[in-house]
């Protein structure tokens, strides 16, 4: 047996220079682990509460000292002396002690940091890789990456309202090959943008953030980069998008409008839900797109039903803001026939136990799962282990730049090397568009 000797929280910075939570846990066997917590920019209304201090004179209100105090006080009192292997029981104890639906008392950022540290301590004490400790002997599936190489929306200061334009190296035979393809396409795209006179600065998730005239221009540039790098669009490499539609949805008029173009006094489109669905359908007809995330606003359940009816047998319809990694909302989606895939973000729900519960619910009901980073990340690579542990087959962890993104790819490469001949690289998206 191994017991928790101490739990300490501290305030560190994320990839955007904002405060976040790091937890250090030490066992009675002197095993010491750390875990840190990410933060999102475009967030769902029903996400677990990220506790911030609100003191405008300290990090402009974004400090997390309240969450740290909760870790060092009541949370530590609950956990010290408990067995490190009791992940689910301890997660449930923290949820019960918090006593709120959204973890608003302790803060989801406090609870999650502790939950992840518990898993790391258990794995290290058991002398197992983290993915094996969480997933057992059947954890061997390396995920196909969604690589966000052009950023827009809340992740970049440009005129694109769609938030992410991604490539998926579905034709690669190994994760190592997939990462190489992605890196080569990324660097090729940089050359294309530079030659065209575009800025090659990157956004929050490491993708380029040029000022482009339309979503179509972004897709065309990516296709050109794929071809110029020597790969076949639609066969070896396909496209994916995250619209993050809640960010440009007007609840009063129930219209989707190009908000960023409007703010820059440019000509902008305005669409009803039906028009938005038709527009996306046209994009899928014209480009090798096999996955679209958050195509409509999170509260537009009827629109999501129509979207799934129209496109759900052709491509992957991914719910992020509408499901927020919460089994309650996923169950509603399953009942209503909304989407066919879920984006899984550990800080949306706030514990490892609930994250795995949501993944099991999705997989049982034939929903694909994509493990995801957040736009405000740290060097912590735990989502790589979780993706392999749960055999999700897909991961979204940014572009091929910025160390906070590359850390996850490098961890996956290490896992693949460790698994050797038992490693399987296979995309879990069941839709083949070629």
Swiss-Prot record:
This entry's comment on the bound cofactor is: Binds a second Mg(2+) ion via substrate during catalysis.
Instruction: Name one molecular function that GO assigns to this entry.
Output: magnesium ion binding
Q: In which pathway does it act?
A: Carbohydrate degradation; glycolysis; pyruvate from D-glyceraldehyde 3-phosphate: step 4/5
Q: Name one GO cellular component term.
A: extracellular region
Where is (2R)-2-phosphoglycerate bound in this sequence?
163, 345, 374-375, 396
Root EC class: lyase
Chain positions recorded as Mg(2+) binding sites: 242, 293, 320
Q: Which UniProt keywords apply?
A: Cytoplasm, Glycolysis, Lyase, Magnesium, Metal-binding, Secreted
Q: Which SMART domains match?
A: Enolase_C, Enolase_N
- Catalytic activity annotation: (2R)-2-phosphoglycerate = phosphoenolpyruvate + H2O
Name the InterPro entries for this protein. Enolase (IPR000941), Enolase-like_C_sf (IPR036849), Enolase-like_N (IPR029017), Enolase_C (IPR020810), Enolase_CS (IPR020809), Enolase_N (IPR020811)
Q: Does the keyword Ubl conjugation apply?
A: no
CDD domains linked to this entry: enolase
- A Pfam family of the record is Enolase_C
Task: Enumerate the active-site residues.
Answer: 205, 345
* Cofactor(s) in the UniProt record: Mg(2+)
Q: Where in the cell is it found?
A: Cytoplasm; Secreted; Cell surface
Biological process according to GO: glycolytic process
Per the UniProt entry, the Enzyme Commission number(s) are 4.2.1.11
Keyword check for Chloroplast? no
NCBIfam families documented for this protein? eno
As for what it does, the entry says: Catalyzes the reversible conversion of 2-phosphoglycerate (2-PG) into phosphoenolpyruvate (PEP). It is essential for the degradation of carbohydrates via glycolysis.
* Family recorded in the similarity comment: Belongs to the enolase family.
What is the protein name given in its UniProt record? Enolase
Q: Which organism is it from?
A: Protochlamydia amoebophila (strain UWE25)
């Amino acid at each position: 047996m191994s017991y928790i000797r101490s739990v300490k929280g501290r305030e560190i910075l994320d990839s955007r220079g904002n405060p976040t939570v790091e937890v250090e846990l030490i066992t009675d066997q002197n095993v010491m682990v750390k875990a840190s917590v990410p933060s999102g920019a475009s967030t769902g209304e029903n996400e677990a509460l990220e506790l911030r201090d609100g003191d405008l004179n300290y990090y402009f209100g974004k400090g997390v000292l309240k969450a740290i105090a909760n870790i060092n006080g009541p949370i530590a009192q609950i956990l010290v002396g408990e067995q490190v292997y009791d992940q689910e029981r301890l997660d449930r104890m923290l949820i019960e002690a918090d006593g709120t639906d959204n973890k608003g008392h302790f803060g989801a950022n406090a609870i999650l940091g502790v939950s992840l540290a518990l898993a790391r301590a258990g794995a290290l004490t058991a002398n197992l890789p983290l993915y094996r400790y969480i997933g057992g002997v059947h954890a061997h599936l390396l995920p196909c990456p969604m690589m966000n190489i052009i950023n827009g929306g809340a992740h970049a200061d440009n005129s694109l309202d769609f938030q992410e334009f991604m490539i998926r190296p579905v034709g690669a035979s190994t994760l190592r090959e997939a990462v190489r393809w992605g890196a080569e396409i990324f660097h090729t795209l940089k050359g294309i943008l530079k030659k065209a006179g575009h800025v090659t600065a990157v956004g929050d998730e490491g993708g380029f953030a040029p000022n482009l005239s339309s979503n179509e221009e972004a897709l065309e540039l990516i296709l050109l980069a794929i071809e110029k790098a020597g790969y076949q669009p639609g066969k070896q490499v396909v496209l994916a998008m995250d619209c993050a539609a809640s960010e440009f949805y007007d609840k009063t008029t129930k219209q989707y409008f190009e908000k960023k173009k409007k703010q820059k006094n440019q000509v902008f489109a305005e669409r009803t839900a039906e028009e938005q669905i038709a527009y996306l359908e046209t994009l899928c007809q014209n480009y090798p797109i096999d996955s679209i995330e958050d195509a409509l606003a999170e509260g537009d359940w009827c629109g999501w039903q129509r979207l799934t009816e129209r496109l759900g047998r052709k491509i992957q319809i991914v719910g992020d803001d509408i499901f927020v990694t919460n089994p309650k909302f996923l169950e509603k989606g399953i009942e209503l026939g909304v989407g066919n895939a879920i984006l899984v973000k550990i800080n949306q729900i706030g514990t490892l136990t609930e994250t795995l519960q949501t993944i099991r619910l999705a997989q049982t009901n034939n929903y694909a799962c994509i493990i995801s980073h957040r736009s405000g990340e740290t060097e912590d690579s735990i989502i790589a282990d979780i993706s392999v542990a749960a055999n999700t087959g897909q991961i979204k962890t940014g572009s091929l730049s910025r160390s906070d993104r590359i850390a996850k790819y490098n961890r996956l490469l290490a896992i693949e090397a460790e698994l050797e001949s038992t490693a399987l690289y296979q995309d879990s998206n069941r839709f083949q568009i070629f």
